[in-house]
Structure formats: structure tokens, C-alpha cells
């Protein structure tokens, strides 16, 4: 049975968020609803989750000593990673001493780079994936491209939001793809994965919850990517019964192998009735922001329920829904928005502005949410809503 203390008191149940972006902000809000004490961490001040936390710390989470100091200071009951760029070896070490890492330190370690999770899925679990090879020099990279064949996809083993990813279609693009991957890796230049190009009908995120009362699945989420980053997502994605069963089988195998309690974003390619594993995040997923309007319990509420040991029960989905990213492009430390009156005059829409303190280039600053009679109608409304929000730099 879960027992929670009272936030700000000596008996508080403390949640330490490692990463304080828009997804962490929603996790923090759900923790606040249960009276949990929230400590938000990130590498920059005034990050979104810090704005709704009890207190915050700014430090480089890849610095194992700095991470240890914050954990020693705060003595959290739950450590909840929101991003991959964390000193995961330190979390593994501390978990062995009794630290509760969500879902597990090993899951965080394996999924922080594409090599760990790909080898788990393909080599240990025998799940269907694209053909792949890893490379850590230009020579081995060129050889991997030749072995895999063109077209193929090149990604840093550690990156997010499409950084460093490219599709190689001709031999002339090989060197540029290598250089781009080296610039886009989260921890600088390094190892890459070369993947065979998958011919798929569509791709989905299957939000999968591992909880005290078993494994649960949200309705599949379809999405559109551009430059490796999500632009729109919708739920439910129409799938054949066989494809849904195959997707749930793959997702359950992966989350059970990773272990622990929490929500996982399992990314899959679908071709007819066949499902191919792509990646998994052991935390809420950006495409899952649609659940803020599409479900009785959002992916963030499900994550908090699961890792605090509460039952999930039945996941209720309200019907065709969609989300569209509100993207900024510019330079500013004083971002302003207008057009919200126009955006919210569109039927069945909502807007979330993340409160990011600045922008230097392109950055996701908010999300538009909508419902409709069909997923197409919901998506069209979400896109229209997002476009109506005007950003001033």
C-alpha cells in the first residue's frame, strides 16, 4: 500500500526530476496533485518544471559527482529521469545502495543510447527490427553503409529530437551524414548507428504502463515527424486487429525486460499486420502529449500513478484527438505570445504554453490540443490552432 507524506514537511514524499522540460512540467503537476514534494533539476535555470516545483537545482546531469551531491542533499524517495543525458552509471551505483530510480536505473542506462536498447530488443529478445550496424570511425561508418545498403538512416547513438539524424540516399551524402551525426550527438562526437531504411505504412507510439496491477496499453498514437522531431500526433491510430496484437506483444516484451514501474513510450513501425521495433523511452513521450486531451488519465498521470505503486485500472480514451507542436524560430530571452483568442475560438481546442525562458534557433514552445469526430478533423483543428498562436521575439 502506498503511503505519502505531506509536501514541505519532514515526512514529505520527495520526487527528484532529472530534466525539467515540458514533459517534466506535466509530471511535476501530477505529483503536486498527490501532495508529493517536487525537486526539479536541469542544466539551465527557470526550466518549465522548475516553475511548478517546490525547489530546483541547476547543474550538468552528466556530471556524476554533481548528481551525487544533489541526491545526497535531497534524499529523494523517487528519482524520475525526464531526459537521456544523465550520468546513468551513477544511478546504477546508487540504485544498488537503495535509491529508487524510475522505472529502474538499468532501463535508464540501456535507453540513454540506441545501442543498448537495440541490442536488447534484437539480440536478447529476438524482436523484429531494421538491419543495423554500429560505427565509431568514418572508415567503419562507410563500411557499415556499404553493408546495410542505400537508402539507410544514420543517427548518433545518443541524441534526441532528431539531432544528428539523416537519410543517406546516394554515395555523395555519406561523408556529410557522418559529419552531421558527429555534430548532433548529445555528448559530442562519437558512435553512430546505421539502420536499413524501413518501408512502413505508418509509425506509432504505443504508450505502455507497467504497474502494480499489470501491463496496460493506451490506444495507439500516430504521428508525423519532420527533421526527426514530432510535429503532430493523433489518437487512436487505425490499425488492424493483428497489428495491434503484434504491437502489444512487442511492447510488453520490451517493458518487462526493462522492468520497474512507470510509463514507457514504445516506438514502432507498422507495415500491414507486421510490426517492427524502433525505440523506447522509459518515460512519457512527446507524441503522447495528445493524451492531455484524449484520455481520462494523461500519460503523465499514468506515469506518476505507476511509479508511486498505485493501480492503473482501466485506461479510458475519449475518442479522436490530436496535438500539434507550437514551434518557435528566433532569438529571444523575452518571448511573447498572442493570437490565443483566435486559437481558442476553434471548437474543442486547448493550448499549453511551456514557459521556456528563451530561444536560440528552433524550439518547441507549446502544443495545441484538439478533439473531433475523426482523427483527421482533430488533427486539422490542432494544426489550425497551433498556427493561430503568434510568437514575438
UniProtKB/Swiss-Prot annotation:
Entry-linked InterPro entries: ATP-grasp, ATP-grasp_carboxylate-amine, ATP_grasp_subdomain_1, PreATP-grasp_dom_sf, PurT, PurT/PurK_preATP-grasp, PurT_C, Rudment_hybrid_motif
Binding residues annotated for Mg(2+), in chain numbering: 267, 279
Limits of the ATP-grasp domain: 119-308
Binding-site positions, ATP: 114, 155, 160-165, 195-198, 203
GO cellular component: cytosol
EC numbers on record: 6.3.1.21
Pfam families: ATP-grasp, PurT_C, RS_preATP-grasp-like
Keywords (A to Z) from UniProt: ATP-binding, Ligase, Magnesium, Metal-binding, Nucleotide-binding, Purine biosynthesis
GO biological process: 'de novo' IMP biosynthetic process
Positions with a binding annotation for N(1)-(5-phospho-beta-D-ribosyl)glycinamide: 22-23, 82, 286, 356, 363-364
Single annotated GO MF: ATP binding
Reactions the enzyme catalyzes: N(1)-(5-phospho-beta-D-ribosyl)glycinamide + formate + ATP = N(2)-formyl-N(1)-(5-phospho-beta-D-ribosyl)glycinamide + ADP + phosphate + H(+)
Pathway: Purine metabolism; IMP biosynthesis via de novo pathway; N(2)-formyl-N(1)-(5-phospho-D-ribosyl)glycinamide from N(1)-(5-phospho-D-ribosyl)glycinamide (formate route): step 1/1
Known function: Involved in the de novo purine biosynthesis. Catalyzes the transfer of formate to 5-phospho-ribosyl-glycinamide (GAR), producing 5-phospho-ribosyl-N-formylglycinamide (FGAR). Formate is provided by PurU via hydrolysis of 10-formyl-tetrahydrofolate.
Homology family: Belongs to the PurK/PurT family.
Subunit structure: Homodimer.
Protein name: Formate-dependent phosphoribosylglycinamide formyltransferase
Organism this protein belongs to: Vibrio cholerae serotype O1 (strain M66-2)
